[in-house]
Design a protein with these regions (language model features):
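Polyanion-binding surface elements
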Residues: 1-24
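Basic Lys/Arg-rich amphipathic helical interaction modules
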Residues: 1-2, 56-130
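Short helix-start
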Residues: 33-57
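Major-groove DNA-recognition helix of helix-turn-helix-type DNA-binding domains
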Residues: 16-42, 76
Length: 130
């Protein structure tokens, strides 16, 4: 099973808010994202991060909606960086270079991203011993 990363780590890697990622994951199915029942935090694999990173770039550069950008990003990944459209239009991305840049940013984000606290907060929050 490939390693998975938290939404906070993904947000730092992609330089977006955690809310942007949560919204994208809530409204769209993305390969490489583990989503379970309510109360279980989402986790993203490298493939999920790559899809979101390409989608973010397409959305920012071309003004595409996030949903369309995710769909195009998944096709680009499936077709190894080249996507042929009708009437000769082609979208090409140096996928290996893009992935290497993503992994470099991810490496930094893993070091600084906070680990999410799960469960009920501690009962004694004043620091006093009882």
């Amino acid at each position: 099973m490939p390693r998975a990363y938290t939404v906070a780590t993904a947000a730092l890697t992609l330089d977006v808010s955690a809310k942007w990622i949560d919204n994208a994951l809530s409204h769209h199915r993305i390969k490489g994202v583990r989503q379970e029942r309510q109360g279980v935090s989402r986790q993203l694999t490298i493939e999920g991060l790559l899809t979101l990173s390409i989608a973010r770039m397409l959305s920012a550069e071309l003004g595409s909606s996030v949903g369309n950008a995710i769909s195009i990003a998944q096709r680009i990944i499936a077709e190894r960086g080249k996507m042929m459209l009708t009437k000769g239009l082609q979208i090409e991305l140096d996928l290996e270079s893009f992935r290497e840049q993503l992994l470099s940013r991810l490496e930094h984000a893993v070091e600084v991203a906070p680990l999410p606290r799960r469960g009920r907060p501690p009962r004694n929050t004043t620091g006093r011993l009882e």
